[in-house]
Amino acid sequence: MGLLDCLAIVIFLEARGEPLQGQIAVGQVVMNRVSSEKYPDSICAVVEQPDQFAFNLSKTPSTAAYFVALSLPHHKDLVGG
């Protein structure tokens, strides 16, 4: 399980059915937490924290969730982080 997989899974589980902006926002929240000293410094560690995100390693994210995860650096900040 790689970092991209962890990010795509949480985007898929938290924001499937949401418009693209909602999916981007979920990814940005995760990345903001990775950058914060208050949270672990890896994507997988952030999304695996108890009671923070819907995260389940047995789920397979959609291709669209991978696309959102890969494209995060190219989107404007939607969450103020």
Regions of interest found by a model, annotated:
Residues 1-81:
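Bacterial extracytoplasmic/cell-wall-associated proteins, especially those involved in peptidoglycan
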